Every structure is written in structure tokens, then in C-alpha cells.
UniProtKB/Swiss-Prot annotation:
It comes from Arabidopsis thaliana. Pfam families: F-box (PF00646), FBD (PF08387), LRR_2 (PF07723), LRR_At5g56370 (PF24758). Residues 6-62 form the F-box domain. This is Putative F-box/FBD/LRR-repeat protein At3g56780. Keywords: Leucine-rich repeat, Repeat. It comes from the Eukaryota.
Amino acid sequence: MTKKVCSCINELPDDLILKILSFVSTKHVVVTSLLSKKWKSLWTRVPILKYDVRDHTRFERFLDKSLFSHQSHVLESLHVELSVTLWNKDIGPWIRTALHHHHCHLRELEIDACIVHTVLPPELFTCKTLVVLKLKGIVIDVEAPLTTVSLPSLKTLHIDHSSLFDFGSLQMLLSNCNFITDLMVIRESRFFFAEYDVSWCKTLMALKLEGLKDVISISSSSAVCLPLLKTLHVARMEDFNNDSFCRLLSNCPVLSDLTLEEKTSDVLLNLDIDMPYLQRLSIITRVDADSKHIFSLMKNYTRKLAIIAPSFKYFSIQELAYASRYRYIVRVRLGVPSKLEDASTFSRIVHLELSICSERSVEMLVDLLLCFTKLVVLKLEHVYLLTPLGRWEPPSLVPECLLSSLEALEWKGYTGRYGDKDLRSNRLKRT
């Protein structure tokens, strides 16, 4: 770095420098202390600390030292990510240090601990200033069963792939988050427990549940109404009850983004309610979807939603790859019927995104292009770069959209191999 550049940076206000450093990992932020006397202590006032712990000894010592050196009255966010090699590391002491040393202003705590056993101190669940709490890992535990939970400021709670103590403690934790707006609970596929009633939380705006038994207790006598809920994602539910889910959907007046498994999505086809704000629908399928199956899903749901959801524009079909990891197969955007000469289902589709993962995907692409006569934007993504496409025979008919309406083509993961070249040359020379 030249003296001129250093001089220009030094002239910036401290608040602006601290803001810039907040977007950089803590490892690199601490290095700035070598620039000058001014920078020697400047890093200790950065409000956000981000640690990516991949080394057993050296990085642990660095984290310990930097966490204690940081000025306690300004730390607002702590993010610790553990690599898979640290499967036996207990990061509880680091969390306790953050809570005790920086308790006054800690607003965000995120633990991304893959396949580790982590002991969480009970003080974590009585932090008055905590707004965001995200826990991700296989085994997360507390030193003792929860008896007291007081998180009055908590707005966002994510529990992702975590075996989090016992169900009673989990219920206590969730039931004492009275002002939460963003809730995500994802359990591993082999862990199911009693249904969890979400109807108590009237402030929810985003809800994602996976691996539970149900979303609303059948025995619940409370009125089911989530007046602010905009995003709902429900998947891998054991003994899912359509009646309880209907109660929920019928009382989410501003719902705009909905994700369901195919086996439970039939409730939409049989539910006669108005969903005036619904714009996005994602269906998760566990089968190797072919063109016929894709067309059937699109036709059924777009026709139904055209009646009950006048704002509906985005439809996607996803495939369950493994655990709770999904990859999309097809995403489409529908045009406004009043602006199209033909308002039929497939002619409304103006934007198509397709995941290319096999010859099956290429055949599906051809079938979709033949049906989507008004397509304007086409985006392709090659998911498996190590699986080249074989040679394929181009269709005898040229899709109408390639000759008239298609304006934009984007292809991510293009490999330049034979199958890709065949597909590219055939598509482009016709467009």
C-alpha cells in the first residue's frame, strides 16, 4: 500500500473506517493494526467480529486473545463458524466471554457449528439485548435444562439442524419469544417430536419449519391468526394434518411466499380462500420429475392460483436432494394476463430458469420451450459440472419463442463440452 493511499484512508472519519471494517473477517481486521499508531487500537472498536475457525491451536489462541482485547462497550455482533475438523470443540467459553465481557450491547450471535458438540451457557437465554440468535450444528446442548428464558428483544431465531437439549426446553425457549418476527426450526430427518403450535405468535413475518410433526396443535383452542406472516416454508412434516394447515393458511391474510411439499400441497387445490397477496409458490418433489410431471404441476397450480391469488407471478419446482438440501428444477415467472393476447397457463410464462443436471433436463428444456410460446428470458444452470451432457438429437420443430419472443439467455456453469456445445449451437442459431 503506497503512502498516498494510506494517507487518504487515514483522513477518513473513524466511524466510516469502522463501518468498512465491519464487512471484513476479524482475521484481516486485526492485521490493520500494523498500518500505523492510529490503526493499532482502531480494530478493537469494530462492532462486528467474524471468526472462521479451521485450525485447532493457532486460530483458537487468536480468537481468545482478540475477543478479550476487543472493547466491551461496542461489540454488537459475534459470528463463529467451525469447520468439520473441529467436531469435538466446545465453544461455550467463547460465548460466555462474549456475554460477560460484552453483555451490554451484544445484539447478534450466530454459531455455525457443523458436527460439533457445543455446550451453551444458560446466560445466553437471558440476554436482554439479543435481537438475532442463529444456532446451527448437529449437537447443541446447555449445561442444565432450561428453567428461565428471558429474551425480550429477540426478533430472529434460527435453529438449523441442531439437536437442541430436550423438547420441553425448546418449547420454553420458543414460547418466551413474544415479539419474534423470523422463526426457523429445522430438525434432522430422523428427529421428530410433538407438534408445535405457532398460533401464539402474532408478530411472525417469516416462518420456516422442517422435521416437526405439525404446525398447529390439533387440541389448540386458540384462534389461529398470523396477521403479519408473509413467508411460510413447511417441509418434512411427520403426520402432517391438513385440517390444521388449512386453519393456518386461512388466517394469513398477507402471505406472499409459500413453500410446500408436493404430498401436502394438494390442500391448495381444495382450499377455497382468497390469497390476494400471494406472489410465489414453491413445490418440493421427491421424485425424478419428468416433463409430464412438471407440466401437470404447473397446469394444476397456476390455474387454481389464477382464481384465488390474483397477484401470483412466480412458481418453482424443487427436488429434495438429501437431508433438507434442495435444488430447484424449474422456476418460472408469469406475465400479467391483461397484457397478453392469450391468457392460457403456459402462454403466461415469460421467464424460465432450469437446472441442467442430466440428459433428462435437456429433454425437459425442449418440451418446456415448445410450450412456453411467449418466453422472454431463459436462464440455465449446469448443476453437476463433473457430469458432462452426452450428444443429443435436436428437435424437429423449432420452439416458437426462439423465433419471436426470446430476448435474453443466461447460462451458468457452461463447460464447453460436446453436449453443452450441441445445446448451445442449436439454441442460438435458431434464436
